[in-house]
């Protein structure tokens, strides 16, 4: 788990996301509070519960991007799910407890990756011996092995093909056990029941270079205690897990509506115990959810936060409102982030030998077009910039292979020539921009 201070977390998010200071502060404090709780002892640590967050704001202003960047920063098990993917228990579809099961799988993969690094040196030696066995045979003399080992370490044998025995991928057929609680837990792999069937292997023909990572991972896994690894992963989920629930507004029940809304309310009711704290059965063991941090987000265009069940509102105590993007924000989004759209397009066309240059007035014009179309057609926030940029650079992208070595300057006139008419014609921009 990361121990960044809130200020460091915000400054890291600032590298990729423009504006939305309140939302950044809220998630930074929530993330730091996870670390603070782990410094406490005994009963107090158990009593301190996470303050779950509800992010409210129109589409395309950075809600999901904040979640994505937070996942990379957190160094903790993180899962982003759409609330609309789930159905009430008893209906066909996934139930909300699957969120926790998926989170456990994410944690196991993270812990396994970390532990593999701890035993990498030993795994590398064992993998090297397996490659030498394939090259010169297990019964070869020490002198021959040493000679080939030197060549192997120098990289002289990287292109040589060898045959190695590797673990067969666990693509065991799945079947459902009727009546098992929690819907998806009923899908059991035959491999889970009968174990690894004596460790099934298959012979693969690979180059020495390609076999390197596969063999190291296999040898590392042999050195790991799987039961201890799973237990550690469950512990990490219970104390550090973060779930980002997107599109929470789509499961709101609006006043005066009925019929299909029933299962939406059911999903909310199923979420209540999960967020409040319950024990979820997974195939790896029971997982307590009291200390998992939930961050919910929604545009709330049609529904309002007050349309959520009152109990669910109470379980999301921190409200953060994200602002709609202004023209100045659009301009900054085009230029400031480390992987801004303009930098991406310049890099893409550089691969063809074409140098793109954007003048300041071109950036102003792009921002103006995006804001104009958002205000007249449908406000989709920063995502509109991608549509506008694609339209502006359509011709250049098409002919780039024939124009290697050229420098092309994009100015306001060029932008207007390519999208100006479409932006003014509302009927056309509905379909094209």
Swiss-Prot record:
Keywords: ATP-binding, Chaperone, Cytoplasm, Nucleotide-binding, Stress response. One of its GO terms (cellular component) is HslUV protease complex. Pfam families: AAA, AAA_2, ClpB_D2-small. GO terms for biological process: protein unfolding; proteolysis involved in protein catabolic process. Its main location: cytoplasm. The keyword Nucleotide-binding applies. ATPase subunit of a proteasome-like degradation complex; this subunit has chaperone activity. The binding of ATP and its subsequent hydrolysis by HslU are essential for unfolding of protein substrates subsequently hydrolyzed by HslV. HslU recognizes the N-terminal part of its protein substrates and unfolds these before they are guided to HslV for hydrolysis. This is ATP-dependent protease ATPase subunit HslU. It comes from Rhodopseudomonas palustris (strain BisB5). The lineage of its organism: Bacteria, Pseudomonadati, Pseudomonadota, Alphaproteobacteria, Hyphomicrobiales. The gene is hslU.
């Amino acid at each position: 788990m990361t121990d960044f201070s809130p200020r460091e977390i915000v400054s890291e998010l600032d590298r990729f996301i423009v504006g939305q200071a309140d939302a950044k502060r809220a998630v930074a404090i929530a993330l730091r509070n996870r670390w603070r709780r782990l410094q406490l002892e005994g009963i107090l640590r158990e009593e301190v519960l996470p303050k779950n967050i509800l992010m409210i704001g129109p589409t395309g202003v950075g809600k999901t991007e904040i979640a994505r960047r937070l996942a990379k920063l957190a160094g903790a098990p993180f899962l982003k799910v759409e609330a609309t993917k789930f159905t009430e228990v008893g209906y066909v579809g996934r139930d909300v407890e699957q969120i926790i099961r998926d989170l456990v799988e994410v944690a196991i993969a993270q812990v396994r990756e970390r532990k593999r690094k701890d035993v990498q040196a030993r795994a590398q030696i064992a993998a090297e011996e397996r490659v030498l066995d394939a090259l010169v045979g297990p019964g070869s003399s020490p002198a021959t092995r040493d000679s080939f080992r030197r060549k192997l370490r120098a990289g002289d044998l990287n292109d040589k093909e060898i045959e190695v025995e590797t673990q067969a991928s666990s693509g065991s057929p799945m079947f459902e056990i009727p009546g098992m609680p929690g819907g998806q837990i009923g899908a059991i792999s035959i491999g889970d029941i009968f174990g690894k069937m004596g460790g099934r292997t298959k012979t693969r023909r690979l180059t020495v270079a390609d076999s390197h990572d596969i063999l190291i991972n296999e040898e590392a896994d042999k050195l790991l205690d799987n039961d201890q690894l799973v237990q550690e992963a469950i512990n990490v989920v219970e104390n550090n897990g973060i779930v980002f629930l997107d599109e929470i507004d789509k499961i709101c029940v609006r006043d005066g509506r009925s019929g299909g809304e029933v299962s939406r309310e059911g999903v909310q009711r199923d979420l209540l115990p999960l967020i409040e704290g319950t024990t979820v059965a997974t195939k790896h063991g029971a997982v307590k959810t009291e200390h998992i941090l939930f961050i919910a987000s929604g545009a709330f265009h049609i529904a309002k936060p007050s349309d959520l069940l009152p109990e669910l509102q109470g379980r999301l105590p921190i409200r953060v409102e994200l602002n709609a993007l202004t023209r100045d924000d659009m301009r900054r989004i085009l230029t400031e982030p480390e992987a801004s759209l303009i930098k991406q397009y310049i890099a893409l066309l550089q691969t063809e030998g074409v140098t793109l240059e954007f003048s300041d007035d071109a950036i102003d014009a792009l921002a103006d077009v995006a804001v104009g179309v958002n205000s007249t057609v449908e406000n989709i926030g920063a995502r509109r910039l991608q549509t506008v940029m694609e339209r502006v650079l359509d011709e250049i992208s098409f002919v780039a292979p024939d124009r290697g070595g050229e420098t092309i300057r994009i100015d306001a006139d060029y932008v207007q020539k390519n999208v100006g008419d479409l932006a003014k014609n509302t009927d056309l921009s509905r379909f094209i921009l």
